[in-house]
Design a protein with these regions (language model features):
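Histidine-dependent nucleotide/RNA phosphoesterase domain, centered on the 2H-phosphoesterase fold
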Residues: 1-178
Length: 178
């Protein structure tokens, strides 16, 4: 089963802002579906059912307080001249989100999991497969723009089923803030 640990985006103001940007940007890429918006705190990959149970137990030992995050600015990975990912940035709550991702990893390292790169708080809103051209001008107008805020009060272990129409996510377990 393909799984990951995530913080879901559920605030309607944020989701409406994302939908608006996805419509405004003229990019030959695939917009992420609004109901799939999330931060991937840690991608675990293909995991056997027995190990998933152990992952759940480890995640349920996690203690964190609820906190707020705010979304500001639009950027691109690896860079706006050759974009592959278009993202929203995080301002308020960035450090807490980074710490939460570290805490998740610390819980899961004993089970053999590790991140291949440090967690960088961003919300993917587009994926681009083929060269889309330089989008610097398109995204620069959003550099200081706020897109709303949300309270982070839970994380989820989620299953991802890949289909030709896009991924289908389902919750395996929800861990609420203490």
């Amino acid at each position: 089963m393909r799984v990951f640990v995530a913080v879901e985006i559920t605030d309607n103001t944020v989701l409406n802002s994302i939908e608006k940007i996805q419509t405004e940007l003229k990019i030959s890429g695939k917009p992420i579906e609004i109901h799939n918006m999330h931060f991937t705190l840690m991608f675990l990959g293909e995991v056997e059912e027995e190990l998933i149970k152990r992952v759940q137990v480890q995640l349920q030992t996690l203690e964190f307080s609820a906190f707020d995050i705010s979304f500001v600015g639009v950027g691109a990975f690896p860079k706006p001249k050759f974009p592959r990912i278009i993202w929203l940035g995080v301002e308020q709550g960035k450090e807490k989100l980074i710490q939460l991702a570290k805490n998740v990893e610390e819980r899961l390292v004993p089970l053999g999991f590790s991140s291949d790169k440090p967690f960088s708080p961003h919300m993917t809103i587009f994926r681009i497969k083929n060269y889309a051209g330089d989008i610097t001008d398109q995204i620069s107008k959003y550099s200081g723009v706020g897109f709303g805020a949300q309270r982070v009060s839970s994380i989820k272990l989620k299953q991802s089923i890949l289909t030709p129409k896009g991924p289908i996510y389902s919750d395996i377990v929800v861990i609420n803030a203490k």
